Amino acid sequence: MKMKDELINLIINEGCIKFGHFVLTSGKESNYYIDIKSLITNPKALRIIAKLIKEKAEELNLNYDKIAGPELGAVPIATALSLETNKPLLIVRKKKKEHGTGKVIEGNVQKGDKVLLVEDVTTTGGSVIRAAKILREHGADVVGIFVVVDREEGAKENIEKEGFKFYPLVLVSELFKAAGISKDQS
């Protein structure tokens, strides 16, 4: 079984597709929710995700020297990828710390760093765009944004409009097809 198919099966079998009424981070309302956070506590799933991102980045000849993820959902993914690639980790906070060092980025970000940014789920891409812009403001070059699941609700277009390259591992349409769910059911 291909790793991507294995990931899709894990997402389905771990019950990550939930139905009901949900308000997403983007503020949009939805009748389904992709709960990747329950998946990214699974070491097997994290290994698969990290290997898929690493392989795809290699296929694309992406040159990067650091891995970043916005808190909270992307941190385990970024950590797994950091371990898989042996590249340093950066964590982009949702907001600047009010205490201690007051950092918005944890880790050593420097001007000219080539950063691979990861995210768990994208809808409009707002959260990951914000993280990418913060990295850019600190002198980093975001060479690619990888997401585990893209809901196909504008993230690709919004991210690319901001000048970033976007690489989803799985599209929600692929998940629904594999789970035997029609878009109308969702």
From Swiss-Prot:
Entries under CDD domains matching the protein: PRTases_typeI (cd06223)
Pathway named in the protein's UniProt entry: Pyrimidine metabolism; UMP biosynthesis via de novo pathway; UMP from orotate: step 1/2
Residues annotated as binding orotate: T123, R151
Keywords: Glycosyltransferase, Magnesium, Pyrimidine biosynthesis, Transferase
Pfam families: Pribosyltran
List of residues binding 5-phospho-alpha-D-ribose 1-diphosphate: R93, K94, K97, H99, E119, D120, V121, T122, T123, T124, G125, G126, S127
Gene Ontology biological process terms, A to Z: 'de novo' UMP biosynthetic process; pyrimidine nucleobase biosynthetic process
EC number: 2.4.2.10
Known catalytic reactions: orotidine 5'-phosphate + diphosphate = orotate + 5-phospho-alpha-D-ribose 1-diphosphate
InterPro entries linked to this entry: OPRT (IPR023031), Or_phspho_trans_dom (IPR004467), PRibTrfase_dom (IPR000836), PRTase-like (IPR029057)
Family from the record: Belongs to the purine/pyrimidine phosphoribosyltransferase family. PyrE subfamily.
Subunit structure: Homodimer.
Protein name per the record: Orotate phosphoribosyltransferase
Gene: pyrE
